[in-house]
Amino acid sequence: MAKTASPGATPPGNGAEPLPDNYETALAELETLVARMEGGALSLEDSLAAYRRGAALVAFCQQQLEKVEQQVRVLDGATLKPAAATDGEDDDL
């Protein structure tokens, strides 16, 4: 028998929930999901939904880290290195 979703009963992790606004919020939600899954009290269906949500959160966190890494590369290449190559006038920074 085919399973149909009931209206208003959207399980977490099926793609319907929007991703968090920032890395810290996503990481906190991911940690909560992991704790719930490790607790062993979730049904198989809830575990699968939590896994899917967790996978989406991990992908989001990786994407955010890659963005920050790219920004650091830009800063390191264009701004930070030339500023560090001064004659020592601003050594107290």
Curated annotation (Swiss-Prot):
Residues 1-22 are annotated as: Disordered. Its EC number is 3.1.11.6. One of its GO terms (cellular component) is exodeoxyribonuclease VII complex. Bidirectionally degrades single-stranded DNA into large acid-insoluble oligonucleotides, which are then degraded further into small acid-soluble oligonucleotides. It comes from Burkholderia multivorans (strain ATCC 17616 / 249). This is Exodeoxyribonuclease 7 small subunit. The lineage of its organism: Bacteria, Pseudomonadati, Pseudomonadota, Betaproteobacteria, Burkholderiales. Its main location: cytoplasm. The gene is xseB. It holds the Pfam family Exonuc_VII_S. Gene3D superfamilies: Exonuclease VII, small subunit (1.10.287.1040). It catalyses: Exonucleolytic cleavage in either 5'- to 3'- or 3'- to 5'-direction to yield nucleoside 5'-phosphates. GO terms for biological process: DNA catabolic process. PANTHER family: EXODEOXYRIBONUCLEASE 7 SMALL SUBUNIT. One of its GO terms (molecular function) is exodeoxyribonuclease VII activity. The keyword Cytoplasm applies. Keywords: Cytoplasm, Exonuclease, Hydrolase, Nuclease. It is found in: Cytoplasm.
